């Protein structure tokens, strides 16, 4: 090892005796933390020696002494770079911070560089130091280098006080300037070096290291971070280690870093040139492939004589030609051409190309400017509607009005006003089987338009209406767009079937999506999520069908024109069965028109006694069953065609009637009244039964059964309170209610019921119970009752009167304020019923209860049943 060179210092140097830990082709600068693998014998021996023997030092170089570990100094080693087997003259004093085992086995030591040092002369190992690398102290080895561990003098160099050895730090002292000037120069060099290092680290994406470097304020510490730099050679790092002067270190680092950045710029320029060349070659390859495809298509066209099948239909050029030739709105054409441009830039193997082609096919398939010519022959349109459906005059009149208005607009040249055309949104509400769905086809045929049915029952995904966004795999347009594409025109009749069966879940609310579709003020600019272009729906005739209006949100119902289909009369059912149902079922049974003849009396019996519904589905099923019986008897030889069926023959084919008038039987006893109600299947007859508990065994209060809702329970309470407060006026023994409980029951018990219209029926039943006068068997009633006895209006009058007519009742009591609703009731039903319009409960009781006779006239007294009902005029 070379002798210690001369170093000019301002005070006495600090000399320590430390074990040498050689580093092959590596340099540790002060401030660096390194992990040393102790599988190397020299490394392990040096670490063990430092930990067992410590270091020796003295502030006076002329009288050095050895201090023990007990003095508090941490275990230190001298990290000496070794290049080509030779130890360098400069080294780093390192503190052993931790020794431990590695996860994969073996051990390692964590050493932190603390100061620069010059390597001095060889010293004997301290007493008690392990010099063999085995970790066992040998008390007899007090001199020499030991077996594997060398101890030397380490002259610690102070960056702030020392002048580097040799020519590295101007040994002649020619550099002028005060300490303040030197500090300013060092700060300037540090800022410049920090900027270069930060730029280099940002290029590499080492953002965490950038933050660490930016946090260093000491110039010397900043310069020593160069020990981590991979672009510096070992010789350059040794030169930095031997340069205590901070300014000189920073100058050299600036020179080396700038040279490295220049090399990086040249390498980046070369890489960019190579990449541009590759891109140019790839672009040229794609263009040549497209040119070959165009030439191939041209040659095929020439060979086929210009036939339409020559084009592939899947190439971007073909899509561009189709878009330019199609009759598209300007905004749609611009969007389609933009997608064609994307398709031309897309690789054939990219899945995006398939998505673009699907979108273009959808756009090109839509009939953007195709509209069916409306049939303005109003008389012919009405004839079509009458031929397909009996009754339903409200709907037919509305369609005729729509056609008349469109013809008027066409004559006046008002096809489009404010961007909107003359479409309509109608809601057909009514019980099942009244012909709501089939009516849509008849309307389309009468108007000369195409018809599309969109089934919405059970739909819970908002995307089913507005479409899926194209970012999703397998995206499709919504049902409205698909219906327009299927119809082939922009003004079809679209039937939104079962709109009240829509549901909502985590995927959205389809009814909210329908708000834009069915709003005449918005649907001329409808935007499907898949198409993302405006679609004009203002010329579409939307027909929405529903059974229960309460299930439709109010904002959606507000956007539709409501038309109620309350059901058919018995005569209308007979006409429908004779003109439509019978012919259809004859075909399904394989019978000719003259093989089976069903008389009108038999059809009346089927409609009134074997079925009792608002629609005609059960009636059609009964006809089908009847014809099957006939076919079976013919096959068995029990009958021969042709067969004529009258009302008396039905029992032999279908058994006894299922529905017979029961009002007379139920109301024969006091306490039972007949009411009218509206259900999801139309109108129905409702019976209210009341009874009084025995005075000795029954408790007080009122008991309500029959799955009654809150409103219906309140109606019973109001009825009882009214009778208690007006019992004297009505000549009713209300004193019996003091200690006798009242029970009100509304069959059938398994069916939930609610609503205010049963109030008058409950009042009549309780009055009948208290007076002992039965309710007339031919009377039905409906209306809400107040505490003062006023009869208030209710809804569903048409359906309730149809139900009363079906049940064979002849007298109906209605609130006075429901008089205008009688205009909606079919004339045959109005003529068959005696309708009394009442305003007070007293009128109801006078009309509904059987008259009471005293004993002097030989009749019954109050509290007993007996005499037959007497008809009363309104």
Swiss-Prot record:
Its EC number is 3.4.21.53. ATP binds at residues 430-437. GO terms for cellular component: cytoplasm. Induction: By heat shock. Belongs to the peptidase S16 family. Signal peptide: none annotated. ATP-dependent serine protease that mediates the selective degradation of mutant and abnormal proteins as well as certain short-lived regulatory proteins. Required for cellular homeostasis and for survival from DNA damage and developmental changes induced by stress. Degrades polypeptides processively to yield small peptide fragments that are 5 to 10 amino acids long. Binds to DNA in a double-stranded, site-specific manner. This is Lon protease. Pfam families: AAA, Lon_C, Lon_lid, LON_substr_bdg. The keyword Nucleotide-binding applies. It catalyses: Hydrolysis of proteins in presence of ATP. Residues 667-851 form the Lon proteolytic domain. The lineage of its organism: Bacteria, Bacillati, Actinomycetota, Actinomycetes, Frankiales.
């Amino acid at each position: 090892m070379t002798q210690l060179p001369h170093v000019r210092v301002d005070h006495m140097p600090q000399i320590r005796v430390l074990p040498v830990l050689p580093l092959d082709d590596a340099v540790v600068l002060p401030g660096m933390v390194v992990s040393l693998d102790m599988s190397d014998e020299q490394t392990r021996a040096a670490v063990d020696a430092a930990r067992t023997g410590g270091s020796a030092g003295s502030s006076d170089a002329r009288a050095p002494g050895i201090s023990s570990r007990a003095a508090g100094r941490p275990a230190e080693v001298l990290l000496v770079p070794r290049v080509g087997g030779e130890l360098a003259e400069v080294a780093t004093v390192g503190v052993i911070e931790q020794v431990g085992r590695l996860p994969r086995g073996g051990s390692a030591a964590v050493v932190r560089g603390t100061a620069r040092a010059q390597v001095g002369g060889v010293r004997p190992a301290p007493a008690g130091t392990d010099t063999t690398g085995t970790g066992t102290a040998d008390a007899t080895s007090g001199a020499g280098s030991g077996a594997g561990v060398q101890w030397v003098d380490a002259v610690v160099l102070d960056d702030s006080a020392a002048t580097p050895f040799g020519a590295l730090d101007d040994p002649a002292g020619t550099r002028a300037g005060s300490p303040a000037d030197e500090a300013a120069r060092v700060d300037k060099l540090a800022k410049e070096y920090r900027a270069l290092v930060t730029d280099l680290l940002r290029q590499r994406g080492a953002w965490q290291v950038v933050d660490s470097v930016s946090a260093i304020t000491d110039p010397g510490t900043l310069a020593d971070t160069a020990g981590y730099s991979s672009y510096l050679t070992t010789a350059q790092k040794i030169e930095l280690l031997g340069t205590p002067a901070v300014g000189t270190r920073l100058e050299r680092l600036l020179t080396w870093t700038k040279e490295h950045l220049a090399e990086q710029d040249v390498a980046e320029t070369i890489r960019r040139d190579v990449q541009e060349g590759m891109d140019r070659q790839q672009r040229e390859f794609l263009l040549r492939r497209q040119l070959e495809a165009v030439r191939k298509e041209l040659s095929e066209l020439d060979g086929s004589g210009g036939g339409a099948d020559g084009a592939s239909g899947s190439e971007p050029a073909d899509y561009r030609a189709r878009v330019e030739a199609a009759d598209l709105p300007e905004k749609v054409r611009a969007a389609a051409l933009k997608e064609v441009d994307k398709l031309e830039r897309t690789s054939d193997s990219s899945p995006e190309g398939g998505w673009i082609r699907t979108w273009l096919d959808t756009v090109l398939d839509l009939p953007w400017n195709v509209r069916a010519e409306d049939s303005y022959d109003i008389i012919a349109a009405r004839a079509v509607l009458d031929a397909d459906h009996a009754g339903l005059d409200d709907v037919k009149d509305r369609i005729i009005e729509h056609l008349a208005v469109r013809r008027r607009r066409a004559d006046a040249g008002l096809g489009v006003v404010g961007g909107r055309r003359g479409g309509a949104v109608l809601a057909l509400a009514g019980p099942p089987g009244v012909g709501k769905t089939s009516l849509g086809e008849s309307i389309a045929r009468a108007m000369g338009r195409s018809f599309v049915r969109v089934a919405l029952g059970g739909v819970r995904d908002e995307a089913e209406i507005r479409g899926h966004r194209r970012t999703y795999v397998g995206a499709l347009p919504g049902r409205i767009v698909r219906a327009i594409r299927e119809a082939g025109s922009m003004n079809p009749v679209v039937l939104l079937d079962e709109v009240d069966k829509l549901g909502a879940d985590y995927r959205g609310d389809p009814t909210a999506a329908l708000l834009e579709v069915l709003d005449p003020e918005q649907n001329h600019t409808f935007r499907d999520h898949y198409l993302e272009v405006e679609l004009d729906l203002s010329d579409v005739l939307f027909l929405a069908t529903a059974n229960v209006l309460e299930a439709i949100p109010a904002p959606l119902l507000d956007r539709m024109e409501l038309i109620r289909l309350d059901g058919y009369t018995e005569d209308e059912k007979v006409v429908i069965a004779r003109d439509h149902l019978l012919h259809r079922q004859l075909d399904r049974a394989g019978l000719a028109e003259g093989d089976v003849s069903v008389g009108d009396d038999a059809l009346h019996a089927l409609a009134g006694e074997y079925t009792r519904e608002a629609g005609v589905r059960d009636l059609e099923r009964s006809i089908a069953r009847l014809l099957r019986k006939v076919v079976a008897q013919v096959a068995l030889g029990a009958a021969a065609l042709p067969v004529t069926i009258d009302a008396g023959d039905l029992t032999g084919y279908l058994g006894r009637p299922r529905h017979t008038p029961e009002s007379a039987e139920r109301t024969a006893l006091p306490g039972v009244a007949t009411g009218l109600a509206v259900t999801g299947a139309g109108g129905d007859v409702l019976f209210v039964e009341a009874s009084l508990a025995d005075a000795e065994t029954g408790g007080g209060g009122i008991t309500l059964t029959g799955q009654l809702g809150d409103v219906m329970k309140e109606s019973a309470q109001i009825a009882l309170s009214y009778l208690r407060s007006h019992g004297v006026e009505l000549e009713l023994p209300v004193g019996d209610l003091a200690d006798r409980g009242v029970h009100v029951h509304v069959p059938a018990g398994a069916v939930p019921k609610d609503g205010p219209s049963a109030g008058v029926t409950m009042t009549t039943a309780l009055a009948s119970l208290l007076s002992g006068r039965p309710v007339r068997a031919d009377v039905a009633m409906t209306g809400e009752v107040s505490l003062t006895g006023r009869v208030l209006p209710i809804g569903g009058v048409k359906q309730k009167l149809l139900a009363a007519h079906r049940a064979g009742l002849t007298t109906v009591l209605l609130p006075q304020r429901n008089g205008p609703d009688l205009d909606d009731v079919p004339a045959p039903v109005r003529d068959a019923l005696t309708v009394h319009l009442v305003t007070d409960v007293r009128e109801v009781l006078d009309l509904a209860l059987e008259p009471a006779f005293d004993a002097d006239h030989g009749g019954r007294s109050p509290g007993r049943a007996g005499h037959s009902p007497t008809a009363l005029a309104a």
